[in-house]
From Swiss-Prot:
This is Soluble pyridine nucleotide transhydrogenase. It is found in: Cytoplasm. The gene is sthA. The keyword NADP applies. GO terms for cellular component: cytosol. It comes from Marinobacter nauticus (strain ATCC 700491 / DSM 11845 / VT8) (Marinobacter aquaeolei).
């Protein structure tokens, strides 16, 4: 049995693991990263962020072609199957894996394939296909990510019942689809399949879509999903899911029954903490498989850290990467350490959504004297040129100091547009001000110009 010694060992080669390993290596630590899959990238690259966003992009191009009058003059609408649009996603996945594998070799991080389990507080056992290795470490970072939560009373082995990972194995385009769970993943897939002409029933156990969003943005998403043919059912809980050779029947606790060609479960995720030997180091995950950490990403065992989806909120690839970097920054005593607690939300529905900061509801409950500046995309020259006129930018600011309190965007490129506002919000003191957008010259025509339009709109409300 081979034995190796490292300063830092990272378990999991997804975004948080990559961020942790790269940062530790840059600080001259001897680093190993352990991945139980054949290739790096984690759920983000293979089943989550990358394939779903590549799918969305392809579907959005199809929608643009089919709704643009200029294209209609030269041909009929075109429809593509789900497997066909998935081909582009597979190409992107391959490029991402190659790129990220090079990161490790270039930075002299040892990439070890195998399943890791703690033997004690300073040793890991790595079981590969043909060998067993022991690794001694000074510090460890658990970055094993998460997977879809699968209720035991639903038969996910049935060929018509999918979860948000296995849906990428779908070999045909269903005519009808039931999606259970109207969170971020469920809403994104509802947009994707509706764009392919699939009749979608979106079942929401809650009272409104994505309730953490600003109410106006949530309402806009509801409207556009319905406008694209998605039937949204709120306050519904499943009773049973039964599949047969001809379809799937969802029985709801309210007494309703819905039938479709396929069923997609998108309700909740669980941390990947099984078989890690956590009991050997005195760690116990919660009921969702997640590990508790302090403000330095340390678990209850001081030299063992955790980051990314395995610790829960916010379960975003962007935040996971920064959490991993932060965990290794604490190990290396990096002056740039920060606890990641203020991250923008990016939701890749069609149209997309992004926000950062407070919502109107939160500010109202806190009795903050705020006001609103709005810019509607239909009034922007760039949006008129591109034909992407659906959407808006909304700036929430303090009525007296003009401090920016929240940015909310709905429409094409929302996830890009939000970062301009985020950059100003993160400035200290008087630099965080609505005045920046009023006194700054923006390129024309651009979508960024929406900030000037919204700022002037908000300024006009002040008296």
């Amino acid at each position: 049995m081979a034995e190796h010694h490292y300063d830092v060992v990272v378990i999991g080669a997804g975004p948080s693991g990559e961020g942790a390993a790269m940062n530790a290596a840059k600080h001259n630590r001897r680093v190993a990263i352990i991945e139980d899959k054949p290739t790096v990238g984690g759920n983000c690259t293979h089943w989550g962020t990358i394939p779903s966003k590549a799918l969305r992009h392809s579907v959005k191009q199809i929608i643009t072609f089919n709704t643009n009058q200029m294209f209609r003059d030269i041909g009929e609408p075109r429809w593509f199957s789900f497997p066909r649009v998935l081909q582009n996603a597979q190409k992107v996945i391959g490029k991402q894996v190659k790129l990220r594998t090079q990161f490790y070799s270039r930075n002299r991080v040892d990439l070890i394939n195998g399943r890791a389990a703690f033997v004690d507080k300073h040793r890991l056992e790595i079981r590969g296909n043909k060998s067993v290795e022991t690794i001694h470490f000074k510090q460890a970072i658990i970055a094993t990510g998460s997977r879809p939560y699968l209720p035991p009373d639903v038969d996910f082995r049935h060929h018509r019942i999918y979860n948000s990972d296995s849906i990428l194995n779908l070999s045909h385009t269903p005519r009808t689809l039931i999606i259970y769970g109207a969170g971020v993943i469920g809403s994104e897939y509802a947009s994707i399949f509706a764009g392919l002409g699939v009749k979608v029933d979106l079942i929401n156990p809650g009272s409104r879509l994505l309730s953490f969003l600003d109410d106006e943005i949530s309402d806009a998403l509801s409207y556009h999903l319905r406008n694209n043919g998605v039937l949204v059912r709120h306050n519904e809980q499943y009773e049973s899911v039964k599949g047969d050779d001809h379809g799937v029947v969802l029985s709801l606790q309210s007494g309703k029954k819905i039938r479709a060609d396929a069923f997609l479960w998108c309700n909740g995720r669980s941390g990947n903490t099984e078989n890690l030997g956590l009991e050997n180091v005195g760690l116990t995950p919660n009921s969702r498989g997640q590990l508790a950490v302090d403000e330095h990403y340390r678990t209850e065992v001081e030299h063992i850290y955790a980051a990314g989806d395995v610790i829960g909120w916010p379960s975003l690839a962007s935040a996971a990467y920064d959490q991993g970097r932060a965990a290794s920054s604490d190990i290396t005593q990096d002056e740039y350490f920060r606890f990641v607690d203020d991250v923008p939300t990016g939701i890749y529905t069609i149209p997309e959504i992004s926000s950062v900061g407070k919502t109107e509801r939160e500010l109202t409950e806190a009795k903050v004297p705020y006001d609103v500046g709005q810019a509607f995309f239909k009034d922007l020259a760039r949006a008129q040129i591109t034909g992407e006129a659906v959407g808006m930018l909304k700036i929430l600011f303090h009525r007296e100091t003009r401090e920016i309190l929240g940015i909310h965007c709905f429409g094409d490129q929302a996830a890009e547009i939000v970062h301009i506002g985020q950059a100003i919000m993160n400035q200290e003191g008087e630099a965080n001000s609505l005045n920046y957008f009023i006194n700054t010259t923006f390129n024309y025509p651009t979508m960024a110009e929406a900030y000037r339009v919204a700022a002037l709109n908000g300024l006009n409300r002040i008296f």
